[in-house]
Amino acid sequence: DNRQDGLLQSRDRAVVKTRGDLDNRGGQVVGLNELQVQAAALDNRSAGLLSSKGDMDIEVARLDNSAGGKLVSERRTLLKADRLDNRSGRIVAGQDLDLSSRLIDNRAGDISSTSRVVASAREQLDNRGGKIVGDSGLDITTPRMLNQDKGVLASRDGLRLSATELFNGGGGLLSSQKGIDVSLAGAFDNQAGSLDSRGFLTVKSAWLDNQGGTLSSAGALAVTSQGALNNQGGRLASDAGLS
């Protein structure tokens, strides 16, 4: 129990291992060189802070980083959890950020890296009103991707999304300076949503609803829909050719 301004700090490598739960609500766990946490559950709500000047490895069954919780690493971050709750929380890495979970809830949350972000959610990734940014690349794999309510998926480099379904309505945005590749086995709902690429844009889906939505690219734009394509009030635009 490290609640309410509690402080666990190591000048070198900080290792916290417990078979039970780690309660860090409003507390701080700091590794000045490296931080490793293993627990059944980690409660980092209420402005709890886990930080490392080096790498950060977290492996838990349940991670609650909501309500202002912060996970901050200046180098690589590896996070494995069965369930990750980052609603109104922040996860920030200075180098590669690798997230693996069954369920990721990032509503109104912020997940970012100045390097590459790889996120895998085995059941669902909910980014409604949230932001996931990988400056050097963003790679997301999940059956169900929710990015409505002005959710943002962005990268200065390439952005790749592989899913069964993508819901990007209500001002949702996928943005990249290099290229966007969206591959969907099922539906793509882009009503009043946007995909904006300064490079290529490739979209494959079973069916596409782009009512009031925008698919635009400075490079080649390729849209493949096995079923219906509804573009009523929508826009498909490319500076380099449309197919």
Question: Where do the model's predicted regions map?
Answer:
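Short, T/G/N/S-enriched strand-turn elements that build extracellular solenoid repeat scaffolds
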Residues: R3-L8, N24-V30, R45-S51, S66-V72, ...
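Well-ordered beta-strand segments characteristic of repetitive beta-sheet solenoids
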Residues: D1, L8, D12-R19, N33-A40, ...
